[in-house]
């Protein structure tokens, strides 16, 4: 299948703008979040693990709400409006509320941060992804070609994040609010009341439809697979790898700056892969594509246990550019092929996002404790071993079903 980027489709442009602005906002602080907490605020590995656990646990509550409500709303925007306000308020919150509280009253800062980040980012990311995926199915373009702009946004944010962070993290936080304001303006332009296809996903969704998903054995196989792979990968990539990489250099500041550059380049590659991989997944099937993504995941984690050369680790980091698009696109296509496509937000947010978050909640603190006592190498060996075991589980138990690809009527290019 030929690569088709539908720039003339106005709905594609809206979906791309949503993704670009959200992810550039997120990357400006999230890509260096662990370094900020540990290097600037002085949190221990145990405190860092506890903070990540509480953040993820709180986001689970919002994910459950977001998934069910957005499936009922179709493509209506109340929840997207909520996200836009969180983006705008991020700068003042981080500077005047979160940072002082973590230093003076860790428990209160922990709780307020978990509520804020869960509502706007950790659950909001899945909400926005599922919202743009609904747009893609309703308005006839591949989700990955729009999501690629989110990766480009993340790359741009990550590139400048390291530069501004080395001057003052507060610059990063204020820029998030600036891009949040632009996100809000884009949301104003997308007039959901004018679209004829808005209710297509939501039509006839009943309580029984949601219950049927949770009774499906295949759903729970999928959840177990996600917990055993994506949860551990997020712990590795978010909590451990940034500090590990920065520590490979003589100066922590130099390592932080180079990590920002590397992260930016990696996400540019990720964006290119995000646009191409949907067509690869259509060819090989979502199960096979998902398993390939997990093989890359295991190799990347294991390589960090075996090598400490910054050049080798930098090359290993770039594997993320293939792995993440493979996993995310495959999850959406696996969900549509195996479950009720009207419930795509519920499946993605509960089956993928909540499942991985539960794993992070349960595993972040033990991983932090293991790191404090044994160091990076032992933790990386342990995580890669578990991911390999779950790869075998997926080979035997994940479904091989595929969605039937149907040619759709083109959508008009203007609103």
UniProtKB/Swiss-Prot annotation:
This protein's GO CC annotations: plasma membrane
Molecular function as annotated in GO: lactose binding; lactose:proton symporter activity
Keywords from the named record: Cell inner membrane, Cell membrane, Membrane, Sugar transport, Symport, Transmembrane, Transmembrane helix, Transport
Transmembrane feature ranges: 17-37, 49-69, 78-98, 108-128, 148-167, 171-190, 221-241, 261-281, 288-308, 312-332, 343-363, 378-398
Periplasmic side: 38-48, 99-107, 168-170, 242-260, 309-311, 364-377
Pfam families linked: LacY_symp
Cytoplasmic-side positions: 1-16, 70-77, 129-147, 191-220, 282-287, 333-342, 399-415
Pathway recorded for this protein: Glycan biosynthesis; sucrose metabolism
InterPro entries: LacY/RafB_perm_fam, LacY/RafB_perm_fam_CS, MFS_dom, MFS_trans_sf
Places the protein is found: Cell inner membrane
Source organism, top-level taxon: Bacteria
Biological process (GO), any one: sucrose metabolic process
Bilayer disposition of the protein: Multi-pass membrane protein
CDD domains documented for this protein: MFS_LacY
PANTHER family assigned to the protein according to its UniProt record, in alphabetical order: 3-PHENYLPROPIONIC ACID TRANSPORTER-RELATED (PTHR23522:SF10), BLL5896 PROTEIN (PTHR23522)
Assigned protein family: Belongs to the major facilitator superfamily. Oligosaccharide:H(+) symporter (OHS) (TC 2.A.1.5) family.
Protein function: Responsible for transport of sucrose into the cell, with the concomitant import of a proton (symport system). Can also transport maltose, fructose or lactulose, but not glucose, lactose or melibiose. The substrate specificity is directed toward the fructofuranosyl moiety of the substrate.
Protein name, as recorded: Sucrose permease
UniProt organism field: Escherichia coli
Classification of source organism: Bacteria, Pseudomonadati, Pseudomonadota, Gammaproteobacteria, Enterobacterales
């Amino acid at each position: 299948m030929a690569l088709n980027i539908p720039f003339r489709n106005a709905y594609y442009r809206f979906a791309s703008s949503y993704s670009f602005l959200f992810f550039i906002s997120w990357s400006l602080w999230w890509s260096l979040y662990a370094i900020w907490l540990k290097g600037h605020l002085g949190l221990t590995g145990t405190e860092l693990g506890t903070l990540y656990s509480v953040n993820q646990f709180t986001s689970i509550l919002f994910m459950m709400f977001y998934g069910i409500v957005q499936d009922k709303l179709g493509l209506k925007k109340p929840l997207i409006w909520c996200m836009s306000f969180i983006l705008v308020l991020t700068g003042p919150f981080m500077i005047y509320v979160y940072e002082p509280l973590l230093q003076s009253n860790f428990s209160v800062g922990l709780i307020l941060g978990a509520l804020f980040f869960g509502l706007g980012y950790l659950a909001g990311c899945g909400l926005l992804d599922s919202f743009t995926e609904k747009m893609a199915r309703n308005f006839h373009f591949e989700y990955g070609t729009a999501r690629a702009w989110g990766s480009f946004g993340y790359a741009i944010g990550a590139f400048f994040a390291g530069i501004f962070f080395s001057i003052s993290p507060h610059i990063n936080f204020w820029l998030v609010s600036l891009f949040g304001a632009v996100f809000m303006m884009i949301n104003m332009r997308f007039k959901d009341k004018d679209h004829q296809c808005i209710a297509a996903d939501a039509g006839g969704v009943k309580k029984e439809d949601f219950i049927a998903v949770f009774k499906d054995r295949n759903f729970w196989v999928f959840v177990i697979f996600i917990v055993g792979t994506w949860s551990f990968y997020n712990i590795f990539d978010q909590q451990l790898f940034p500090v590990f990489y920065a520590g490979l250099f003589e100066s922590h500041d130099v390592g932080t700056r180079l990590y920002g550059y590397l992260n930016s380049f990696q996400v540019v590659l990720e964006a290119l892969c995000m646009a191409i991989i949907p067509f690869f997944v259509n060819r090989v099937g979502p199960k096979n594509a998902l398993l390939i993504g997990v093989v890359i995941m295991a190799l990347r984690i294991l390589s960090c246990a075996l090598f400490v050369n910054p050049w080798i680790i930098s090359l290993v980091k770039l594997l993320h550019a293939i792995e993440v698009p493979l996993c995310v696109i495959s999850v959406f296509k696996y969900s549509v092929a195996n479950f009720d496509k009207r419930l795509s937000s519920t499946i993605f947010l509960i089956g993928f996002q909540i499942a991985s978050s539960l794993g992070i909640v349960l595993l972040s603190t033990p991983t932090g404790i293991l790191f404090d006592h044994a160091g990076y190498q032992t933790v990386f060996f342990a995580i890669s071993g578990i991911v390999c075991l779950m790869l075998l589980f997926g080979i035997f138990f994940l479904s091989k079903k595929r969605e039937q690809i149907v040619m759709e009527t083109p959508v008009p290019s203007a609103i």
